[in-house]
A protein has these predicted regions:
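Short, small/polar-rich motifs associated with maturation and membrane association
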Residues: 1-366, 373, 378-380
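Surface-exposed loop/interface segments of Gram-negative outer-membrane beta-barrel transport/assembly proteins
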Residues: 154-155, 160, 171, 229-312, ...
């Protein structure tokens, strides 16, 4: 069922970027620049749509069969908090002159979404999110108020608990524009469990560069994680599951020919003396016709083989994809006394893709301690660790694209159960044996990431208007990437210049064996910051205020 509509404010102005969700699910869309939306939902009753946008009251609308829904959203008159966090300071919102947007993490949680950057879509004005790949676990590209290449890329700066965090792999200019590589490795917060986040502040104007320099040319996203509270221990368990349906030939949007229709088309093209492209792989009906004209088979054999092709109806989607179930678990405990407060959590994510064999496993751990050592001295410690493994097929294999573009008349298996190969053209001179199942079984891309981050802080309260802050952070990240092609694959045959099992020519670059590429990155960073903060109110009814900070910071990576 398709539902369309428009979202406006009380002044009848359209609202782009509004998140529209089917209540109780992760199924949703975002309104376009005209404020319009178009969402397809399964048959269910009742149908309740949830509309949300930063600065507006969340609204629920029950669908009763309207042809076009009109939703008017009202402004949220209450502020999230009386303060905002910039990473260096906590500022009274009433005194704020910068463009800063603040949201609570609990307000943007979407079931089944395991990345906080994806949850920000439609919730932060001037923030644009794009994904260049449909693969599981890929990192979207974030853009805040346009783009800049002043610092070599266009990504915003991430700050967690006052510390700038870097990507797990420092990228050079050769790979910055490679979406297959950049999207898969994850960004600076890929190892952070969204369930551990308390709030998010987004800095978008010159105030960001004042604090962080040229690194903030593309904006700053400040994340504050959860802390302990005074009281008895509170244990929480959160679990989300998602279901991803694989493509099927019966889907309305997949209008592809069956084997009989494809062979009939080939007959029409042959009767019209159609000239095929020189780089086309000759397979199926065209291959049999070529064999017939060459005298390799007779008319009777030709008719028998064509009949087999008409009855193949290979279900490539069933062979290469599967319905996928994913799940996410977080167990946390928090509590404490006036002197010591704590928050700790462990998390596990298993995110499976519809492409068989693709998926992500991730483990996270978090510990936060806060202690009032004296009336004038407070100490805190935040520790975060993560381990993840990502398994993908080689991007050159392209299972989903292959299923969409390959004739169903082509068989995946021989009658005896062995793989069925055809000659795939490499260039005008060479053709080698190809079967996509052989490519998948003998190639892979595997990425393993791990790391930990430790932040310690001392806060000195000299007076009620003057305090000092000393912060130390140490972080380690490891990234291992492995790409493999076996010697029996078409990919290696093109390098070897011969089919598997056939002697390679003397000028072959790879006469035997396969291809293995490994990239290992180890990154260690530390930073030390000392800061003095002044926030003094004076005068009648404390109408006047002096606010400032003086600090020194050093870092290394």
């Amino acid at each position: 069922r398709k539902i369309t509509g428009i979202v406006m404010d009380t002044r009848k102005q359209s609202l782009p970027g509004v998140t529209v969700l089917l209540k109780g699910t992760a199924l949703g869309v975002v309104t376009d620049k005209e404020g319009r939306f178009n969402i397809e939902i399964p048959e269910t009753d009742p149908i309740v749509l949830v509309f949300s946008f930063v600065g507006m009251k969340k609204q629920e609308v029950t669908y009763t069969g309207q042809e076009d829904i009109q939703v008017v959203m009202e402004e949220e008159v209450t502020e999230m908090d009386e303060v905002v966090i910039t990473g260096y300071q906590v500022i009274d919102r009433k005194k704020l002159t910068s463009a800063i947007t603040s949201v609570k993490a609990e307000d943007i949680m979407i079931p089944g979404v395991n990345s906080i950057d994806q949850m920000l879509e439609g919730r932060i004005p001037d923030l644009m999110l794009t994904t260049n790949s449909g693969e599981v676990g890929v990192v979207p590209r974030l853009r805040i108020r346009g783009t800049s290449t002043l610092v070599g890329n266009r990504e915003p700066l991430w700050v967690v608990n006052g510390v700038v965090v870097n990507d797990p792999v420092p990228l050079d200019s050769d790979v910055l524009n490679d979406p297959d590589y950049v999207n898969r490795i994850g960004n600076a917060i890929a190892g952070l469990n969204p369930q551990d986040i308390q709030r998010i502040d987004v800095l978008k104007d010159a105030a960001a560069t004042t604090l962080y320099g040229t690194r903030a040319a593309n904006g700053v996203i400040v994340i504050t994680t959860k802390k302990g509270h005074v009281g008895k221990p509170v244990v929480r368990y959160n679990m989300t599951t998602t279901y991803k349906r694989r493509p099927r030939y019966s889907d309305r949007k997949i209008d592809l020919m069956n084997s009989k229709e494809r062979i009939d088309l080939s007959r029409e093209l042959a009767a019209a003396s159609y000239l095929y492209p020189s780089d086309m792989s000759i397979v199926g009906y065209e291959y049999l016709l070529q064999q017939l004209y060459a005298g390799v088979i007779d008319d009777e054999q030709f008719a028998i083989e064509v009949k087999k092709l008409e009855n193949n109806n290979t279900d490539w989607f069933d062979i290469l994809t599967e319905d996928a179930f994913s799940h996410n678990h977080t167990l946390s405990i928090s509590g404490g006394t006036d002197q010591l407060r704590y928050y700790s959590s462990v998390g596990y994510t298993k995110d499976n893709d519809v492409i068989k064999g693709q998926g992500i496993s991730r483990y996270t751990g978090n510990l936060s301690l806060e202690s009032d050592l004296t009336k004038w001295l407070k100490a805190s410690m935040d520790f975060n660790a993560n381990i993840s493994e990502r398994n993908y097929e080689q991007s050159a294999v392209g299972s989903v694209n292959y299923a969409y573009t390959t004739s169903r008349a082509i068989a995946a298996y021989e009658e005896g159960g062995d793989l069925s190969y055809y000659q795939k053209r490499y260039n005008s001179f060479y053709r080698y044996d190809f079967n996509i199942l052989n490519e998948r079984a003998n190639s892979y891309t595997k990425q393993e990431n791990s790391g930990f981050d430790l932040t310690s802080r001392l806060v000195f309260r000299f007076t009620d208007w003057l305090n000092g802050d000393v912060l130390f952070n140490y972080a380690v990240s490891n990234a291992d990437n492995e790409d493999y092609w076996g010697e029996s694959t078409y990919h290696v045959a093109c390098i070897r210049k011969s089919n598997y099992g056939v002697a390679a020519p003397s000028d072959s670059e790879l006469p035997y064996g396969g291809e293995l590429s490994e990239q290992n990155t180890r990154n260690k960073t530390y930073s030390l910051r000392a800061q003095l903060n002044l926030n003094k109110y004076f005068g009648e009814e404390e109408k006047h205020n002096i606010n400032g900070a003086l600090g020194y910071e050093m870092s290394s990576s």
